[in-house]
């Protein structure tokens, strides 16, 4: 067993398939205290998780194993690890990965600063990988460096959207019943074909459920089940709950899961996952300007238009003054979208200050941060061509900060003297800003758009 995070700063490329938001929420943690037998005010120390991550992803139709496929330039498995490690009462996370991808996994752990992760080598099947992960937590293994948990969660590396509430439910049920698993209603009717390819029978959809992840077990129950497991079940079995029933006579409690427990299986699922992630990190926009007192400042006008046009998004504003203390707090609170208003048309001073603050923070490690550098110009008084040369500095700025996962765009908004025309320019600018934030298109960084 190997523990992270060794390896290089940049993840290596995953090998081809070989044949053969924030911390845990107080309510959930408090509820688990009685489950794990901890004293009030202390985090439970009896829950671990095992993630089998040795699959080839043949149904994905790409050479890279799906757990390493990038979403917003970050491997899928990193999102799943993040979902688990932000739950403070999961003390150890064991990932089973193939030998040829061990270095890849180490570098992912290092680059994205994952914690509490230990690595073991995967087996040739899913069940053998899970068994190897359980062995890393068992007391009877000579080289085991981890303490045995009371409850172990088994989850898929390619289900990145698991929430703490679902984890809490299955752990609580496993504590009481010995085993528990998340289920969802069947989407399609299940049929059984006969040998000649005709319908034999169909299942009544209302009476059956789809087994999902996560699942949780008393560690002694599932470890004993795997120790007794036949070679046939280790090779061809797919359901961990069935092993607990078959070998330990433990009937699992079935827990209704949330709709976002789905598994990334096909290539189209990667696009769906990316869309969900983009939506989640686009729910807040901070308008940054050089003043906080003048309500008629054009930055405040833009803020009000953004609020009007994007009524489903939280829009706030902060000044760069006071050493940026309030702005630093917004960064700590994980806002991933900034609109920086520059007072002088050709001056990037405010944008440069903001970029420096972002680069000094750890905000950009997990998700790309969008910065829209906004400049205003009365096109009737000053033709855009006269200022364009200075504004094109944004190209070089964008190249530099892209290396630190910051997506920098430029926006030039017409600033006419007529109030009605100004409102229309601001509205067009808000539409462009919303699109840049929603799409997060790295191909457009350094471009100067005009509203």
Curated annotation (Swiss-Prot):
Family annotation (InterPro entries): IspD/TarI, ISPD_C, ISPD_synthase_CS, Nucleotide-diphossugar_trans
Gene3D superfamilies to which the protein is assigned, alphabetical: Spore Coat Polysaccharide Biosynthesis Protein SpsA, Chain A
EC number: 2.7.7.40
Keyword Translocase: no
One Pfam family cited in the UniProt record for this chain: ISPD_C
Keywords carried by this UniProt record: Congenital muscular dystrophy, Cytoplasm, Disease variant, Dystroglycanopathy, Limb-girdle muscular dystrophy, Lissencephaly, Nucleotidyltransferase, Transferase
GO MF annotation, one: cytidylyltransferase activity
Domain of life: Eukaryota
Record-marked site positions (Transition state stabilizer): 59, 66
Catalyzed chemical reaction(s): D-ribitol 5-phosphate + CTP + H(+) = CDP-L-ribitol + diphosphate; D-ribose 5-phosphate + CTP + H(+) = CDP-D-ribose + diphosphate; D-ribulose 5-phosphate + CTP + H(+) = CDP-D-ribulose + diphosphate
Keyword Cytoplasm assigned: yes
Pathway: Protein modification; protein glycosylation
Site features described as Positions substrate for the nucleophilic attack, chain residue numbers: 205, 263
Tissue distribution of the protein: Ubiquitously expressed, with high expression in brain.
Localization, UniProt: Cytoplasm, Cytosol
Family to which this protein belongs: Belongs to the IspD/TarI cytidylyltransferase family. IspD subfamily.
Name of protein: D-ribitol-5-phosphate cytidylyltransferase
Organism of provenance: Homo sapiens
């Amino acid at each position: 067993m190997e523990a992270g995070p060794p390896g290089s700063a940049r993840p290596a490329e995953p090998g081809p398939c070989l044949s053969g938001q924030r911390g845990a929420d107080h309510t959930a943690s408090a509820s688990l205290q009685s489950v794990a037998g901890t004293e009030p005010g202390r985090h439970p120390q009896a829950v671990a998780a095992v993630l089998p991550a040795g699959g080839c992803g043949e149904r994905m139709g790409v050479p890279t194993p799906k757990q390493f496929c990038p979403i917003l330039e970050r491997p899928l498995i990193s999102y799943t690890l993040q979902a688990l490690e932000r739950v403070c009462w999961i003390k150890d996370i064991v990932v089973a990965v193939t030998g040829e991808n061990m270095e890849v996994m180490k570098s992912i752990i290092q680059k994205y600063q994952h914690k509490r992760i230990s690595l073991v080598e995967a087996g040739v099947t899913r069940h053998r990988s899970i068994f190897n992960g359980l062995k890393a937590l068992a007391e009877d293994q000579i080289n085991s460096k981890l303490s045995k948990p009371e409850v172990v969660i088994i989850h898929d590396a390619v289900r990145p959207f698991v929430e703490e509430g679902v984890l809490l439910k299955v752990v609580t049920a496993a504590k009481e019943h010995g085993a528990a698993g998340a289920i969802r209603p069947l989407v399609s009717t299940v049929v059984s074909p006969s040998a000649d390819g005709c319908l034999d029978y169909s299942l009544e959809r209302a009476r059956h459920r789809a087994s999902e992840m996560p699942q949780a077990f008393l560690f002694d129950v599932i470890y004993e089940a795997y120790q007794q497991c036949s070679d046939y079940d280790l090779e061809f079995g797919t359901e961990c709950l069935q092993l607990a029933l078959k070998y330990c006579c433990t009937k699992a409690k079935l827990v209704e899961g949330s709709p976002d427990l789905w598994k990334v299986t096909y290539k189209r699922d990667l696009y769906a996952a990316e869309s969900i992630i983009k939506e989640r990190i686009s729910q807040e926009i901070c308008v940054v300007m050089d003043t906080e007192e003048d309500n008629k400042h054009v930055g405040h006008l833009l803020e009000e238009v953004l609020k009007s046009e994007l009524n489903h998004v939280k829009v706030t504003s902060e000044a760069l003054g006071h050493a940026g203390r309030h702005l630093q707090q917004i960064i700590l609170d994980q806002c991933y979208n900034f609109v920086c208003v520059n007072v002088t048309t050709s001056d990037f001073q405010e944008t440069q200050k903001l970029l420096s603050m972002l680069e000094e923070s750890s905000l950009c490690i997990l998700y790309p941060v969008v910065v829209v550098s906004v400049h205003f110009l009365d096109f009737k008084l000053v033709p855009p061509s006269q200022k364009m040369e200075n504004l094109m500095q944004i190209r070089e700025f964008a190249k530099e900060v892209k290396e630190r996962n910051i997506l920098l765009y430029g926006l030039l908004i017409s600033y006419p003297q007529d109030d009605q025309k100004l409102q229309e320019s601001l509205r067009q600018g808000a539409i462009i800003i919303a699109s840049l934030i929603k799409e997060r298109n790295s191909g457009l960084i350094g471009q100067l758009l005009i509203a």
